[in-house]
Amino acid sequence: MNATHAALEPDGLRPGRPRRHRRRLWVVTGILALALVPIGTLTAAFQFGLPWWMQEGDRNHVYESDTGSQGYQVHLPPQYDGTTQLPVIMAIHGCGMTGYGWNSMKSTTQFNTLADREGFIVVYPTQRVFRNAINCWNSDDPREQHRHTGEPALLAGVAREVVEEYNADPSRVHVAGASSGAGTAVILAATYPDVFATATSVAGGEYGLNQVDPNDPGATPPDYTARQAWSQMGDNARHVPLLVIQGEEDAVVPPIVATRLVAHWAAVADFVDDGLFNDSQVLVEETTTVRAAQGRHPYTHLRLATPEGASVVESYLVEDMGHVWPGPDGDGTYTDRAGPDASAIVWEFAKRHPMR
């Protein structure tokens, strides 16, 4: 009988065996679930930080739109009262970083301390690993270089939401980025000149840098990509002052990229002037070299400005500095405390250039 019944069971399986198989499956599933909980927790901590990392004045948000969702943290200084319209600085992190989690733009720049002293709002968007495995912003992807789409649309949406939610000054919204975030900041200056008054690139490159062959950069002149940046501005075209900070020893983004960026943005200004690349925009050049103080890196400051004194592009080329955000109080993997105070430089630049 037993043999007969066994032969009649589907696939020759005995009735008890599927139960043991299911029990093993449940055990394995349970183990996997338990393993995924800490992995998920660690991923969340990496990207969004831990509750006790929050400082006074910090608030977390998620921007939602048809384009997608974007997490970000806002820091409100003590001067914030909901009625006085304060300036805004959006700080965009680089690869292997987050906005306000582990190895964050928040700790790297120490903007919160400066904001508390000077009275401005800071915004830290953070990339999601499902968009980029090493948490880069996708500024080298042509699909992420246009208005109304992708990361530019999300970040501009965040900026607008902050202005509305916290009654910030829409004429004093600025963006600063590091590395891939610097590329995104330049893209935002081109695609949303009606949202961002100025842009800062720290260890970043020009709009459309992905079109430039590192082995033959001269084959793609800066005015070629500048025309594309200007065309992205559309009816909102205007001079968006750009600040560039670059380390001479940067092996990831070499100094030639910053040199190109300066020429590129000067060309954008030329196109904005009359739609032609014809030197119609007269620029006055000023160069200042700051010698090394004890324990500090020397640097050269270049300023290209209109005859009326408005900066078109300024750059800081820092000797003995690599692929970092410089500043005396920076805390993170990509910092150099011997460099000039980039956060203070960004703020001083922003103060001089509200949207006109």
Predicted regions and their residues:
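A domain-start/cap signature at the N-terminus of enzymes
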Residues: 2-88, 103, 107-109, 113-118, ...
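Conserved alpha/beta-hydrolase "acid-adjacent" motif
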Residues: 252-257, 326
